[in-house]
Amino acid sequence: EAARPGFDPDYSHEIYGRLLHSTMAARMPDGDYESLKKHVDELDPDDQSEVARTQRAQVSSFKEWAAANELRHRIRWQWHDFFENYDVLLTPTTPTPAFKHDHRKFGDRTLMVDNEERNYFEGVFWAGLSGVAYLPSTILPTGLGVDGLPIGVQIIGPEYSDLVTIGLAG
């Protein structure tokens, strides 16, 4: 049966990105952080590119982080409602089969999806769908792609159902 939670998955990904990028930036050296903050202050307010959104999240205030965290909790409640009717949700693991590791700087990395170069952060879309809401997910390998790299399916369960998702994958 086709089933979808009651929220826009792209919106969920945006919230995931805000929270993830702000958390990751906490480890940024002070000088780099100050330089990035100055750069962000000079961004065009209408610039909603992935790079601009990432940079804004990296220098967000605690107030902005807390607002995004509140949105996360609203998403969590929508997941709670979803799992009142479904035991688990099956999703892809990534938008592509596994790919070779890219050692370039994170911002320079890209993914090929249907012969189109895409933003590397899109690769964590499916992981973020469960991760932003603290939901357990287990990856079940399902085979190998044409290049010999693995393909899998993600099993997402309700909060605290780790053993359910692991059991289904087992």
Model-flagged regions — what are they?
Residues 23-40, 118-124, 160-170:
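Short, basic, helix/turn surface patches
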Residues 1-19, 59:
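Gly/Ser-rich, acidic/histidine-flanked active-site/gating loops
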Residues 93:
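Glycine-rich, N-terminal phosphate-binding loop of Rossmann-like dinucleotide-binding domains
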Residues 19-80, 96, 101-103, 141-149:
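Short helix-loop capping/hinge segments that flank enzyme active sites or metal/cofactor-binding pockets
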Residues 99-123:
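Short, surface-exposed loop/helix-turn segments at secondary-structure junctions
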Residues 66-70, 74-77, 85, 119, ...:
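Structural helix-boundary/capping segments
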Residues 12-22, 106-107, 153-155:
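Short low-complexity, flexible loop/linker segments enriched in glycine and/or proline
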